[in-house]
């Protein structure tokens, strides 16, 4: 409608069943990779084309990473691998976009209360084998953080931000 792309927020993400690695099917692996990595790549590629050609040129890309980009949960290899890869996508897009005034950053979210995080509040497998509930944060806090990143002038960038519940287990997942 307006002929511009000023902000892209790559926010899609799914997990696979929390099962031992050897029982994960190729289809389950591919579904997570297609949604969590290939989708953001192709959206970023399309945004780059528009952002380079528009006047004034440039724009901002914000990727939804995860605290799983830093530390895995038990039996979440597909999700964890794609979120680590998202960090690489963010860094590469940030570097490649610099000459075109395209800023790219990543927000790593931990336990924002969505349908995906509901099991965490109810009780989820921990690194030590226990099942424990984890604290969550209101999604409005995440929305505000993304808006704050989006509102920056293109001369400034939040490269990485982690937003999580203060008492959420993260380092070592314990």
Each model region followed by its residue ranges:
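A short helix-coil junction within the Rossmann-fold of NAD(P)-dependent oxidoreductases
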Residues: 1-2, 15, 19, 46-58
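Substrate-binding pocket helix/loop in short-chain dehydrogenase/reductase
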Residues: 19-21, 28-30
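Alpha-helical segment proximal to the catalytic Tyr-Lys
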Residues: 49, 95-98
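Residue(s) in the substrate-gating loop at a strand-loop-helix junction
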Residues: 66
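C-terminal helical subdomain
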Residues: 106-107, 125-172
């Amino acid at each position: 409608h307006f002929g511009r792309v000023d902000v892209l927020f790559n926010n899609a993400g799914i997990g696979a069943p929390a099962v031992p690695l050897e029982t994960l099917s190729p289809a389950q692996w591919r579904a997570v990779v297609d949604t969590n990595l290939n989708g953001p790549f192709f959206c970023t590629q399309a945004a780059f084309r528009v952002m380079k050609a528009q006047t004034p040129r440039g724009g901002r890309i914000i990727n939804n990473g995860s605290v799983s980009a830093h530390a895995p949960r038990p039996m979440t290899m597909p999700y964890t691998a794609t979120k680590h890869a998202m960090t690489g996508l963010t860094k590469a897009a940030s570097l490649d976009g610099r000459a075109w005034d395209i800023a790219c950053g990543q927000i790593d979210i931990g336990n924002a209360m969505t349908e995906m995080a509901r099991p965490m509040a109810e009780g989820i497998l921990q690194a030590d084998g226990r099942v424990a509930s984890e604290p969550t944060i209101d999604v409005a806090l995440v929305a505000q953080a993304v808006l704050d990143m989006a509102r920056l002038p293109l001369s400034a960038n939040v490269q990485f931000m982690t937003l999580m519940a203060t008492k959420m287990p993260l380092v070592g997942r314990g």
